[in-house]
């Protein structure tokens, strides 16, 4: 009698190291401080960097402060950009037009042909002119060095621009001989009408090795880590009104959390998983968002493989550095600047060395007093952004040989797509679990 013996696949192991400490708000105390201090900290750190790059960029030119500009004299100035936007919403306008018959227009993008840029340092500010610096590309909060001269009109005519560029990168390990994968997904939106429980369950079954034939299970065994990049929940807005809820409404609110916890406990039983907060999740609104409370996940939190993380989130897997957000930083850039694709926005933040340049101007963030945690000091190998409309990826190379895989993760509830990143070569591909359910 023949006995069929099924091959047992052992999941590959990896070393994990969280780097979220700089995004955690622990010792900070809010004493009514304003946001000027985070801008000052950003300018101080970035100016030191740009000063060090200036001699190799324009060694023959002096570096001046805005207050020290002389008409017609070429020089370099370093400062923070401010973008004057005609269509940018204003709180005062909202109050003044509250009773007006004219509706407040809320366009998807607030760009206007008359927008202009201003450079500011601690000594003063100057309006910028010339075509070398496009208002369509830059936003308020970016620190740059500019080569140019002051005109008779009192403007600074820009002839060239120096950005910080990609930061130094830790060396990729050369001893990775086998394929190992990190799976990235976002926008589960459990509780929404667009959420499909079958899609997520198929993904969970694939990750845990309960789906497919022997070859499929062998591929699943190569998954060593899972990251859920925000917007895991969607609650009924009518119930979130600050009022006491009836027991039935409380149960309705808790249902999406309970459903996600069941799914996460299945994943955590077989592989390590990180969950990041997003715009719609029960976490603080301002960046950096703090980890979702572990009491929300009574089934998952007992596993040491389950981690509730910050947004932004940074970590190493087998010395491959990952950095990512749940998408708020890129979505905000899309409102106040233009690009051919979301990946262009992602690449710009990396070359500006700042995760969220529009914070705190148009993107909420904590008023740090002595540091700016969004500065990118070390170049990641993988830089991902969650909750985008579609999947996209790009491999970029820095001037010092840095290689970075940029990834836009689509909303899983709308696309049924997750992204698998190979640690060995930084190649990535999609895992598609799109299904059709008849609502008739």
From Swiss-Prot:
**Record GO terms (molecular function):** DNA binding; DNA-directed DNA polymerase activity
InterPro entries linked to this entry: DNA_pol_a/d/e_bsu (IPR007185), DNA_pol_D_N (IPR040663), DNA_pol_delta/II_ssu (IPR024826), PolD2_C (IPR041863)
Q: What is its main location?
A: nucleus
Identify its protein family: Belongs to the DNA polymerase delta/II small subunit family.
Its protein name is DNA polymerase delta small subunit
At the highest ranks, the source species' classification is: Eukaryota, Viridiplantae, Streptophyta, Embryophyta, Tracheophyta
Q: Which organism is it from?
A: Arabidopsis thaliana (Mouse-ear cress)
Look up keyword Transferase and say if it applies.
Answer: yes
List the catalytic activities from the record: DNA(n) + a 2'-deoxyribonucleoside 5'-triphosphate = DNA(n+1) + diphosphate
Q: Does the keyword ATP-binding apply?
A: no
Q: Which UniProt keywords apply?
A: DNA replication, DNA-directed DNA polymerase, Nucleotidyltransferase, Nucleus, Transferase
Entry's Gene Ontology BP terms: DNA replication
What this chain does, per the entry, is described as: The function of the small subunit is not yet clear.
Subunit info? Heterodimer with subunits of 125 kDa and 50 kDa.
Q: What are the record's GO terms for cellular component?
A: delta DNA polymerase complex
- Say which domain of life the source belongs to: Eukaryota
Where is the protein found, in the record's own terms? Nucleus
Q: What is its EC number?
A: 2.7.7.7
State the gene name recorded for this protein.
Answer: POLD2
Q: What class of enzyme is it?
A: transferase
